[in-house]
């Protein structure tokens, strides 16, 4: 049984336009119970973590994290259950439930409903993630590690590239691309250590104290802008922009960006450029 959606009354808070059940009729909760369990398992594995799920039901019903977690479970469950709700298995095969007072929904209406449920789920997930990031038990979970793999963990990433439908699906595609992009940027310019620091700071909102915090936030913004460019253009890194960030790292005050300055990556950018040397043919007074 679902821990987040324990009964029909809780379920109906998140399902609009449901006719009240008459005596003897199967409750909607009973009809979609398997889908609720699968949806909760998916949400737990992908977002919540077992630790967060264990304590969520103990929270007040008005708690934001509990509210949006329930909404996400119901939307995901209904997304899978809707195509089956009017089907029954008879001895002669599957049949469609008929009602003389209510016309069956057309294929187009059902498709619009499914798209609406998907959008509701994706919107709910985008609200849920920042709430989870502020939950102490979540910071060491597997879902946290997944979203900590890129500089921009938030689910509105597809919108920044002009995509509005199928946001969660599109996010996962972009997530994989960002990982590949950041591997290249880390190797050539910024180091794995610095990017790891920036990723964690953005997701968990742990930027440290002044005077270092503004430097790290600025570096995050500039590097993420480079990544967005590479996502849009599907091309190579913009070298001038990367060098500009590198120079800001090199010229930062002592004690700032030390996770970068102490590495071989930083050494790649030392002592470059022309120097006026008497031993060289181009020497000038």
Which sequence ranges carry the predicted segments?
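Conserved short "hinge" loops at termini or chain/domain junctions
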Residues: 1-70, 84-285
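Catalytic-loop motifs flanking and including active-site residues across diverse enzymes
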Residues: 73
